[in-house]
């Protein structure tokens, strides 16, 4: 039996590049909502991810579920993506981003200027504030941050954030932690078509099939947290999401068949056997 070659040998694909830094994995993961530190560690390993996001405010305040979180992971093998979760205004997000940069330095990542920018004043649906996000992004870019903004699937906002210097845009598939899946596919498709920076679909992905579908649209990467952390078996789901991310990317690069309104036989009709009259 001949074994199948690795995906990277089937079709040429460049690494994910964000702010000049290259990553092999196109799946990013979070650190919240895990049942235990052991579950977190096993899930990060199973996912094969290289970028892990951490909520700076919750780590700074030792919020429940975040005690010892930073020390639990090997940051010599992972790239820290500090995030400004919990910030309701641009001013708060800017202050927390600065703390996140200092956190990265303390973990040995002296050149890490990445920040996942979240400005979320809405406590029920956790939808990001476009005005606060844009204002914070403009200031953080001036301060030398590599800004990865979390946004609604708004093509105009995505383009504007790119113009002010953000290194990615991160449109939501559906509300954070909702597991509703890819509810904004049409707008995300437009964002992907217009963007010249990586598009990372973030929030709302609930299953591997939804992860694959997002990648099939042409997304450059995914950030998935709740669907992994709250799964019945978090490490197994992490592995499933990693496989789905790879499958979706490979399918996108391979090119799907066009959708038709009629059938098309997979076998030629010539040479078929017919009954005698």
UniProtKB/Swiss-Prot annotation:
What EC number(s) has UniProt assigned to this enzyme? 2.8.1.10
Superkingdom in the source lineage: Bacteria
Swiss-Prot/TrEMBL keywords: Cytoplasm, Schiff base, Thiamine biosynthesis, Transferase
> Which GO terms are recorded in the biological process aspect for this UniProt protein?
thiamine diphosphate biosynthetic process
The pathway it acts in is: Cofactor biosynthesis; thiamine diphosphate biosynthesis
Q: Principal localization?
A: cytoplasm
**One cellular-component annotation, GO:** cytoplasm
Gene3D superfamilies, per database record: Aldolase class I
The UniProt entry, under CDD domains, shows:
ThiG (cd04728)
**Top-level EC class as recorded in UniProt:** transferase
The listed locations are: Cytoplasm
Q: Which residues form the active site?
A: 116 (schiff-base intermediate with dxp)
Catalytic reaction list:
[ThiS sulfur-carrier protein]-C-terminal-Gly-aminoethanethioate + 2-iminoacetate + 1-deoxy-D-xylulose 5-phosphate = [ThiS sulfur-carrier protein]-C-terminal Gly-Gly + 2-[(2R,5Z)-2-carboxy-4-methylthiazol-5(2H)-ylidene]ethyl phosphate + 2 H2O + H(+)
Q: Which GO molecular function terms does the record list?
A: thiazole synthase activity
Q: Which sites bind 1-deoxy-D-xylulose 5-phosphate?
A: 177, 203-204, 225-226
Recorded family membership: Belongs to the ThiG family.
Identify the HAMAP family for this entry. ThiG
Please state what the protein is called.
Thiazole synthase
Q: Its gene? A: thiG
């Amino acid at each position: 039996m001949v074994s199948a070659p690795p995906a990277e040998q089937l079709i040429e694909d460049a690494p994910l590049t964000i702010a000049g830094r290259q990553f092999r994995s196109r799946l990013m993961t979070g650190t919240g909502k895990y049942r235990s530190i052991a579950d977190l560690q096993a899930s990060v390993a199973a996912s094969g991810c290289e970028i892990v996001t951490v909520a700076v405010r919750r780590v700074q305040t030792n919020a429940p579920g975040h005690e010892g979180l930073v020390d639990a992971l090997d940051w010599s093998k992972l790239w820290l993506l500090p995030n400004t979760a919990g910030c309701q205004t641009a001013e708060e997000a800017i202050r927390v981003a600065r703390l996140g940069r200092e956190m990265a330095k303390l973990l040995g990542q002296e050149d890490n200027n990445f920040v996942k920018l979240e400005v979320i004043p809405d406590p029920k649906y956790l939808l990001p504030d476009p005005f606060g996000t844009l204002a914070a992004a403009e200031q953080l870019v001036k301060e030398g941050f590599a800004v990865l903004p979390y946004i609604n699937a708004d093509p105009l906002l995505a383009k504007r954030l790119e113009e002010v210097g953000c290194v990615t845009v991160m449109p939501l598939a559906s509300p954070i932690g909702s597991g509703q899946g890819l509810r904004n596919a049409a707008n995300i498709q437009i964002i992907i078509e217009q963007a010249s920076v990586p598009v990372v679909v973030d929030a709302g992905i609930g299953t591997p099939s939804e992860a694959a579908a997002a990648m099939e649209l042409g997304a450059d990467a995914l950030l998935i947290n709740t669907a992994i952390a709250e799964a019945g078996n978090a490490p197994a789901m992490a592995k499933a999401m990693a496989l789905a991310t790879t499958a979706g990317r490979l399918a996108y690069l391979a090119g799907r068949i066009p959708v038709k309104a009629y059938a098309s036989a997979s076998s030629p009709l010539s040479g078929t056997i017919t009954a005698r009259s």
